[in-house]
Amino acid sequence: MAGGGGRPCSPQRALLGMVAIMAVVAEARWGAPGRARAAPEEDQISVGFFRKNVIYGNVRRAENVYVKMFTNSPSLVCMDLSLSQEEIIDPKYSWTGPDGRNLEGRGYANLTGSGELMLVGFQESMSGAYTCTLSHRIIETSAQEEVDVRDTYRFMVYAYREANHVYQVSVRFTAKGCELAANARFVEELKKIMESLISDLTCGVKGPSYRCHSLEAPHRGSPSELFITFQVNPFAPGWEDLCSRLPQDCEDTTNRRAQEATERIGEFFRKQTYALKHQFQTVPTIHYVEGSFSVTPIDSCRPGFGRNNITHRSCAGCCVVCSPGTYSPDSAGSCRVCAGRRTAGYGAKSCP
């Protein structure tokens, strides 16, 4: 921080004022809680015929079904729509799960005598292919013959989550010049302050990155400025332990934490403006540019989930569980292909 006489000094000293302000900000505990994102009208989405949470099979193709985490699936019907309108003689139903084993007696599988399946309390590990075989008879009255018929219906069921919120933050600081090593040190110190501001929320700062530009500004000469960007996300170490203590899913909680963290950081920079005007006789060489703080919300997916509007067209924008052979280690928003021969199961955060 520059002292009397207007001499430029180190970025560490320039940040002393920020540290003092940070202490005040941390004690204030400001910030209104974030609004919970409204749940969709239907928690389950299907490609096939859709009638009040009932999905019929199709002998020609597998039906894709998307079930929100910790909710119950629609009723999966072991026949197609046209057959359901007919009289069925001596029907027998047999359901198998993704592991190829019969679902009879499984606690999470609610089976009815009419061949319907509901999956209860859906989780990512329950994703996969559910297959039903319908055996019945057709009586040819003219020939007095009975024909045994066996139809197979396949449902690909995927867990999905609502997107989490990540915030892209942009700020600007003045600098003495663009070639100084002090700029990088300043940005690293700034990151430490941001992380300490929001550490109790188990939120983290990803980045930051910066570029330095020389500007032509009226009445200011040709100053240099640091254009700094970073992301605020709710996935700092400890977030999984926090979520495990909640009774069900914690998207609403993580979204509220990310919003509060961003509000704290915004308040911190607003206090910088006040400090520069009222607490410094000499403006530091590196200081915040008033009004440069801006926030852009970015939807992201939790590790193990990703978005793919081509593969999952009927659930565009959903964070769908990563399929076997893919993984998502962070909140980047997409599932990556595993490079090795060994493949992970559904919802992988890393490759084996």
UniProtKB/Swiss-Prot annotation:
Residues 1-28 form the signal peptide. GO terms for biological process: acrosome assembly; binding of sperm to zona pellucida; circadian regulation of gene expression; membrane lipid catabolic process; negative regulation of immunoglobulin production; sphingolipid metabolic process. Glycans are attached at N110, N309. The keyword Ligase does not apply. InterPro entries: Ig-like_dom, Ig-like_dom_sf, Sp38-bd, ZPBP1/2_C, ZPBP1/2_N. It is found in: Secreted; Cytoplasmic vesicle, Secretory vesicle, Acrosome. GO terms for cellular component: acrosomal vesicle; cell body; extracellular region; membrane; zona pellucida receptor complex. Keywords: Cytoplasmic vesicle, Glycoprotein, Secreted, Signal. May be implicated in the gamete interaction during fertilization. Belongs to the zona pellucida-binding protein Sp38 family. This is Zona pellucida-binding protein 2. It comes from Gallus gallus. The gene is ZPBP2.
